[in-house]
Each structure stands twice: as C-alpha cells, then as structure tokens.
C-alpha cells in the first residue's frame, strides 16, 4: 500500500518520532497513536463523521484504560456530541474536560502544521495540546469509547514520583502564561496552577531528596513569586 510511509531514524524519543511523522504528513487530518495502544474498529469512521458534520477542527473521543481485555462497547455507543468554540474549549482544557493527551483526537492538518512537540519533555502532551486547541475555531467531542490505552505496572505514567514529573508543572505554568490574553480563562489556569504546585510540593517532600528536592522547591518558589506579583 503506497499510502503507508515507513520512517527509519535513530530513536530520539516520543516527541521526535511524532515530529518526524508530521514533517511528511500529506493527508487532510492527522492523529497520534502510541505503539502499545489500539483503537476501536470504527473509531476513525465515527470521529470523521463528527468532525465533518459539525465543521470542526478537532474531534475527541472517550478512552478506556485496559490491561489487555476489552469488553464490548456496544452499550456505550451514542450519537451525543458536545461542540465547543475556541474559548470554551480552552477553558475545558484547563478544567480537564478536554483531556490533555493527544492520542484520543483527530486534528485538521492545517491547525497543527509546524506545531511540533518539544523534545526531551516527560509530559510532552501537556505542552502541546492547549496550543493546538487555541488554533482551532471549533472542537467536537463524541461520547463513544474509541481509544484503548494499554495500562501496565511499569508504564511511565504510573511510576513513582520523580524529578522528571516536574515537567508537568512547567507545562501548566507555560500554559497559564500563554493564556494571559484570555482573562477569564487565565484566572482559572492560575488557580489550577496553585493546586498543581501544592500537589508537586507534597509529592516532592515524600519521594525526593537532595538536589532533586532542592530543584523542585526552587521551581515552586519561583512560580509562587510570579503569581503573587501578578495583579490579574
């Protein structure tokens, strides 16, 4: 099948692999699937129907965590959709009503063109998704479970707290700064960031020590200082 393109490259991590694919993308839409996950047979059919019918730029489906056994999702199938305009969608991202992961969505190519993933980040999706949403005029969410996230004990998402997870806090901080042009959403993002700081600080006190703990404390202190002098 000449529609399939195989890229041979040195392993540069998840972001680098996604970026390599984006550099040769040729279709009207793009999606990202992690190699150990899988999708429902009709996921793309349903999402393409929804994105075209509603003239949307992004479509998001529901996902299910699984250890490898998938129950039939017939009882979960529904025609219900949620349609969000740009600012509604940005607020939904901050409130986690739109999940920051990239793999349960499809995107119009034009809105993510040149929007590459930051290399070397632990939570790369957190740095990327809000920017993609900000480029979209309309997002549609469907209620069907279409994506199956393979859950295993040694998954990077479920390992014990470590200093690399501080990337998630940095992503939330960058997101807050990015959203300053949307005053109402900015306030929500700022409050969320305070809670994120508290979470990471508590985790750090429990699991980190030495230079890692010092780094975390310094990061949280810098964010709090920035927030405290912000008059918005």
Task: Describe the residue ranges of each PLM region.
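Acidic donor-binding segment of Leloir-type glycosyltransferases
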Residues: 1-8, 52
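General small-molecule cofactor/ligand-binding pocket signal
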Residues: 7, 140-142, 188, 230
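Glycine-rich, basic loop-to-helix element that forms the pyrophosphate-binding segment
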Residues: 9-25
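Donor-binding/catalytic cores of nucleotide-activated saccharide
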Residues: 14-15, 35-140, 150-163
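Short aromatic/hydrophobic "clamp" motif used to bind/position activated sugar donors
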Residues: 30
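C-terminal, non-catalytic tails of nucleotide-sugar-dependent glycosyltransferases
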Residues: 170-189, 225-231
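Amphipathic alpha-helical repeat scaffolds of TPR domains
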Residues: 191-203
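Membrane-interface aromatic/basic loop that binds lipid-linked glycans or pyrophosphate carriers
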Residues: 207-232
């Amino acid at each position: 099948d000449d529609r399939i393109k195989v890229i041979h490259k040195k392993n540069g991590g998840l972001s680098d692999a996604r970026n390599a694919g984006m550099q040769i993308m040729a279709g009207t839409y793009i999606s990202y699937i992690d190699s150990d996950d899988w999708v429902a047979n009709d996921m793309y059919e349903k999402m393409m129907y929804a994105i075209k019918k509603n003239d949307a730029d992004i479509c998001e489906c529901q996902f299910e965590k699984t250890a490898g056994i998938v129950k039939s999702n017939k009882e979960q199938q529904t025609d219900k959709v949620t349609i969000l305009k740009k600012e509604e969608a940005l607020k939904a991202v901050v409130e986690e009503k739109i999940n920051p992961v990239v793999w349960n969505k499809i995107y119009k190519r034009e809105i993510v063109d040149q929007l590459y993933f930051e290399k070397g980040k632990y939570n790369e999706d957190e740095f990327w998704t809000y920017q993609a949403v900000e480029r979209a005029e309309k997002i549609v969410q469907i209620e069907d479970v279409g994506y199956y996230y393979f859950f295993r004990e040694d998954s990077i998402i479920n390992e014990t707290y470590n200093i690399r997870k501080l990337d998630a806090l940095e992503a939330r901080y960058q997101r807050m700064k990015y959203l300053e042009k949307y005053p109402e959403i900015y306030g929500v993002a700022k409050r969320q960031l305070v809670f994120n700081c508290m979470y990471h600080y508590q985790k750090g006190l429990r699991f980190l020590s030495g230079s890692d703990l010092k780094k975390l404390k310094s990061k949280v202190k810098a964010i709090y200082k920035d927030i405290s002098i912000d008059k918005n």
